[in-house]
Structures are given as structure tokens and as C-alpha cells.
């Protein structure tokens, strides 16, 4: 994980830009620098993952052109070898050094061909144009805004831009900026033809593509570990990785000191795959003391994002403080592809598919945002195998009638895909889903709600919530989060499109809390 900063103007000093960059030093604690160029400034804070020597420090320059990138370019060694055969030379082992040669070869077409999680800014010396781009899902963050002089600025996080741009805007995923315009190079959720193969063929493809997605993300020069909740998704990632590596992996789980639900399942998985497992216990006091820090790191007021981030932030904090790890593989993006508890209520296959596409397109505002910020705030890099582009494209193209829960078990295709591998205990593979914010302990969400209820009187709540026209708070908990958000990001609420909620237009989903606990089909989930 790194931090990038670009300003296409020179009406500020280099020292001022250095100050803006240092607001996200935790993203790149290994080295930081701001370079003045012919068009403005480029800043980079480095967390060394590939090519650990100083030669891998950015920006990279070639024939007057520049690039900065927070990303992982998968398969870069093969790309690098091909470029070397064409006469290109490289100074480092960094994967991102291939970007300028790739741009010279393919121009703007480069972005649609990258197998990567990335956010980058590139200056083309020949055309004098500034270019920025972001991966199709938005796994790596990127924001932009305009200074008082009308010059554009780009940054990894909103906090880099607060106070000196007019409005902090989210850079759209799957897009590039060129010559003052944003161009969509791929809508990853769009389907150009459905797969109507039988279940056995579909599940084999799911198996093989997810396995390859995990394998790609095991490539790192820095030490890596795994977040293991004990739920299906993170357990699969860990089990696949352990099977590939044929050696013990390092896994980490977190739970409340009072009623942790998932810790026993995480330990069962860790023991089964032979992992070096660490449990982190959190308390009510730690959750409440960390709340403001977490909201500042997230730059959101969304209820479910914040709830789910409390455990993730605290386990990552422990990993940062007590280990040498720099990379963590996580289980995000499975729900959006295969379904949440609430998608059991989808009225039709078409409705399920439409909802999945919506969730994939909004990932960068919610689950992917959470994974990035909770890890980056603790100088760790998130890698998300379920976000592998080939995997996402395939699952989105599977006939939605086969993805509907008509099997009596959610995520049936994913479970079935690994049924014969025996890399997980059967009870884990077929366990009911529980939301992470609930699975760390039901008491955590209850503690947050109770704290908010006591924080405001009913009169204060009614008065304060009316201050906000956009995404108006509707509970004391949501008001508390919004007030903390506004303290650090005043007037920037539109960075978040809305509160994450189940599809209220569906029967059984018209609820006022994002937790699956309020759904009629929760059943044995979270037990």
C-alpha cells in the first residue's frame, strides 16, 4: 500500500505539497518524497512490497514522462521480460516500473489490458497531457478536486485534499482521465453474454479461477499473512493459499471478549490447514476509544462500513504493532458476487443480477473502502482474491438463475466448487453466513448503539440530524458517525452515495438497519 499525490499547478510550494502528502504517511512509511516537474508536483509515500531496494522509489521517469502508482501489477515479471526483449531497460524490481514502457507501447489502451489493482497518475511528455486511471473495481483508492486556481489535483485519500480543493470527488473505477475528460474503459459489472453451462462446468471454472486469483496474490517480496474470520470467504482464501504454498501460513482472527462468535470457527480452520494462528481479543472500551480514529481513516459515515471496520481496524493494528507483515489477503467481494442474506429475497433471477451489478459498481464506497483504509491506516496492503478481474467477469456472466438461492443454502455455487477438494472442514464449507460486524460478537454493535443513544437526548438528535439534507441521519448511531465524519471532512458527504442497506423494494427487506440480524431469514447465522 502506498500513497500518491499529484497537483497540476505550481501556485503552491513544494513544502506545502509535502505537508499534504504526509497526511497519509501511514500508507507509505518506508519513504516519502515530492518531486517538482514541468507541469506541477508528484508525491509518493512508499510501502515497499515488490522490489524492496531504494531503486523502487517513485515517481518513475522515462524520457521526460513521469508516473506514480499505488498498485500491484499481476504478471509483471512476464510483462517486464517481454519489454526487455523490445529494448526497454529497468532500474528496479518494482512492478509499477513497467507502466511507462507499457504506455509507450499501447497508449491509453494500456488500462483496459492491465491485470492489476491500481490507482496511477502519468504525465505524457510528448503530448503534454496529464493522465490518471483507476482499476475496474476501485480496490485502490483515488480522489480528485480542483484548487482555487482551477488546477486539478489527485490523491490516494480524501484527507490529502481537504482544505485546498473545492470539493473532494471520488475518481470513478474502471476509468481514466485524459485531456480534462473522464473515460470509462470498462464496466466490470456489465455482462456481454451469459454462461449457460451445467453446474459441474460452472463450479469447476469458479474453483480454478478463484484458485488462480489467490495464487497471483501470493507473489510478494515482503512478508504476507491472512485475515481469517472463520466465515466461508476468508476460510476459502486461507485454505487455497495453504494448499498452494504447502507450508504453514500466518492467520489472524479477532473477536469481542464477551461473545465472540467466529473465533472458534477461525481456530478450527487454522488447525485444519496447519496455520500459525493468532487470536486478537477486543473490548468494548477499545471499540469506543477507536471509533473516531476509524471514521477519520475511513472517510465515511456509512453505518455498516463503520461497524464492520471496528474489528478489522483493531486486528490490523495488532498485526502492525506485533509482526513484520506488510501484506494481508482478505475475503471481500464474495458477497457482492454470490449474494448476501438479503438477496435470498430477490424476486427474480434478473433482479438478483441487477442487484449484484449495483453492488459491484459501488464496492469502492463500502467493503473495498473498508479493506483498504483499515489496512492502510496500519501500514498494511490489502489483496482481495475475490476481486480478481477474470474471476469477477466470469461469475457476473454466470446465468443468474443458477446464482439464486434455490438450493436451501446461500453461495451454493462457491461452496459446491470446493466440495471435493477437502481443503476445509465440511461444517465450515456449508456454514451459514454471518456478517463480520456481528460475527466478532453481537455485543459490539449493541455497544455502539447504546453509546450513541446515551450521547444524544431525543431533542438533540432531532435538531442535529436536520442540519443534513444529504444522507440525513435516521438513528442516533448514524448521527454520531455523521458528526465525527463532518469534523474531519466538512461538507464532503457526497463522497458516499448513500447508506448501505438491503434492497428495500424487495419483500422482506424493508428494514432500517443494515445488519442481516434484522432479516426474517437470519436463522442460524451468527451461531
Predicted regions and their residues:
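ATP-dependent adenylate-handling ligase core
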Residues: 258-316, 322, 339-353, 373, ...
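Hydrophobic (often cysteine-bearing) scaffold residues that line and stabilize catalytic clefts
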Residues: 13, 92-95, 114, 199-206, ...
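Peripheral terminal appendages
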Residues: 157-159, 200-201, 209-224, 439-527
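Mid-to-C-terminal catalytic subdomains of enzymes
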Residues: 325-330, 334-355, 362-473
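Amphipathic alpha-helical segments that form well-ordered structural scaffolds
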Residues: 98, 209, 269, 394, ...
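Short, amphipathic alpha-helical segments that act as regulatory/interfacial helices
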Residues: 6, 100, 104, 314-320, ...
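Cysteine-centered catalytic environments shared across enzyme families
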Residues: 1-300, 322, 326
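Short coil/turn segments at secondary-structure boundaries
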Residues: 33-36, 112-116, 167-172, 219-224, ...
Amino acid at each position: 500500500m502506498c500513497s500518491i499525490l499529484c497537483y497540476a499547478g505550481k501556485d503552491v510550494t513544494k513544502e506545502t505539497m509535502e505537508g499534504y502528502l504526509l497526511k497519509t504517511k501511514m500508507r507509505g512509511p518506508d519513504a516519502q518524497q515530492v518531486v517538482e516537474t514541468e507541469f506541477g508536483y508528484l508525491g509518493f509515500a512508499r510501502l515497499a512490497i515488490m522490489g524492496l531496494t531504494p531503486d523502487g522509489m517513485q515517481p518513475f521517469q522515462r524520457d521526460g514522462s513521469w508516473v506514480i502508482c499505488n498498485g500491484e501489477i499481476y504478471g509483471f515479471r512476464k510483462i517486464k521480460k517481454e519489454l526487455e526483449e523490445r529494448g526497454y531497460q529497468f532500474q528496479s524490481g518494482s512492478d509499477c516500473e513497467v507502466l511507462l514502457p507499457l504506455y509507450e507501447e499501447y497508449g491509453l489502451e494500456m488500462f483496459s489490458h492491465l491485470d492489476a489493482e491500481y490507482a496511477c497518475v502519468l504525465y505524457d511528455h510528448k503530448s503534454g497531457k496529464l493522465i490518471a486511471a483507476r482499476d475496474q473495481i476501485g480496490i485502490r483508492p483515488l480522489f480528485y478536486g480542483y484548487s482555487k486556481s482551477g488546477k486539478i489535483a489527485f490523491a490516494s485519500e480524501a484527507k490529502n485534499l481537504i482544505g485546498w480543493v473545492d470539493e473532494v470527488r471520488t475518481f470513478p473505477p474502471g476509468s481514466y482521465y485524459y485531456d480534462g475528460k473522464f473515460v470509462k474503459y470498462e464496466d466490470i459489472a456489465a455482462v456481454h453474454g451469459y454462461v449457460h453451462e451445467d453446474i459441474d462446468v460452472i463450479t469447476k471454472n469458479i474453483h480454478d479461477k478463484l484458485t488462480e486469483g489467490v495464487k497471483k496474490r501470493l507473489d510478494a517480496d515482503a512478508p504476507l499473512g491472512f485475515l481469517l474470520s472463520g466465515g466461508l470467504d476468508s476460510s476459502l482464501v486461507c485454505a487455497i493459499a495453504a494448499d498452494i504454498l504447502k507450508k504453514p501460513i500466518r492467520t489472524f482472527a479477532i473477536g469481542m471478549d464477551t461473545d465472540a462468535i467466529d473465533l472458534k470457527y477461525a481456530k478450527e480452520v487454522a488447525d485444519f490447514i496447519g496455520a500459525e494462528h493468532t487470536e486478537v481479543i477486543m473490548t468494548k472500551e477499545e471499540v469506543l476509544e477507536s471509533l473516531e480514529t476509524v471514521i477519520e481513516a475511513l472517510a465515511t459515515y456509512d453505518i455498516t462500513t463503520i461497524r464492520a471496520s471496528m474489528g478489522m481496524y483493531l486486528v490490523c493494528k495488532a498485526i502492525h504493532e506485533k509482526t513484520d507483515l506488510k501484506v494481508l489477503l482478505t475475503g471481500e467481494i464474495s458477497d457482492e458476487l454470490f449474494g448476501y442474506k438479503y438477496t435470498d429475497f430477490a424476486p427474480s433471477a434478473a433482479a438478483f443480477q441487477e442487484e449484484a451489478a449495483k453492488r459491484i459498481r459501488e464496492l469502492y464506497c463500502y467493503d473495498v473502502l473498508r479493506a483498504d483504509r483499515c489496512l492502510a491506516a496500519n501500514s498494511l496492503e490489502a489483496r482481495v482474491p475475490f476481486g480478481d478481474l477474470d474471476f469477477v467477469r466470469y461469475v457476473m456472466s454466470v446465468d443468474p438463475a443458477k446464482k439464486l438461492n434455490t438450493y436451501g443454502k446461500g453461495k451454493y455455487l462457491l461452496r459446491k466448487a470446493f466440495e471435493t477438494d477437502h481443503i476445509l472442514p465440511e461444517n465450515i464449507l456449508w456454514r451459514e453466513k454471518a456478517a463480520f460486524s456481528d460475527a466478532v460478537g453481537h455485543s459490539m454493535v449493541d455497544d455502539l448503539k447504546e453509546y450513541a443513544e446515551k450521547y444524544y437526548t431525543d431533542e438533540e438528535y432531532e435538531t442535529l440530524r436536520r442540519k443534513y439534507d444529504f444522507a440525513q441521519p435516521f438513528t442516533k448511531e448514524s448521527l454520531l458517525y455523521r458528526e465525527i465524519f463532518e469534523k474531519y471532512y466538512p461538507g464532503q458527504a457526497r463522497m458516499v452515495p448513500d447508506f448501505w442497506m438491503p434492497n428495500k423494494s424487495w419483500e422482506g427487506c424493508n428494514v432500517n438497519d443494515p445488519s442481516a440480524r434484522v432479516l426474517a431469514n437470519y436463522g442460524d447465522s451468527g451461531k
